[in-house]
Amino acid sequence: DIGTGTGLIALMAAQSNAQARIDALEIEPAACREAAYNIRISPWAERIRLYPQALQAFFPAIGYDCILCNPPFFVHSTPAPDNGRSLARHTGTLPHTELIVHAERLLTPHGKFQVILPVEEACQLIAYARRYHLFPRKITRVHPNPGKAPKRLLIQLTRQTLPPVETDLTVELSRHHYSEEYIALTREFYLKME
């Protein structure tokens, strides 16, 4: 999990796959402390290792079958005055181009790189990934509600050059009324999801 923040995605991955061993990277000290705490109190602590370092300095002895990332979204905007928030939201310390370079370096031959981005940034990332022989295998367009344009793309990149499987996911049918598909996808992660 690249840029784990408070560890949420790493914890969700551990909860979803009982065999998974997860390495989580985070460079922001306060977020790293919170991730360490969240991991420590979870039932999956023995399967998650937290590395307080940048992706660019991470050179494990193994490759990864799956790399997850919810990267900083904002490319050309004013950073937040709070440095921690800025690191989490802006691409200054991890441009999407570097994300691709390092994901390609860390993936096993049949590995998958899964990322969520706003539509425009996702399209740019897909185009750049092709230079590193990573191709979209799955693309899910995430719509906030019916009739609205997608706000995010969930992308799975692999070394396979097959045509991507494309799907749509609508989050809410109306305010706080979640779609059945979204409920089915997220139910195990919420205390109350209806």
For each predicted feature, which ranges?
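Mobile active-site "lid"/loop adjacent to the S-adenosyl-L-methionine
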Residues: P71-E98
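SAM/dcSAM-binding transferase cores
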Residues: K148-E194
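Phosphate/oxyanion-binding loops and surfaces in catalytic or ligand/nucleic-acid-binding neighborhoods
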Residues: F74, Y132, Q160
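Conserved SAM/SAH cofactor-binding pocket of Class I
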Residues: D1-P81
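Conserved Class I SAM-dependent methyltransferase catalytic core
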Residues: L94-P150
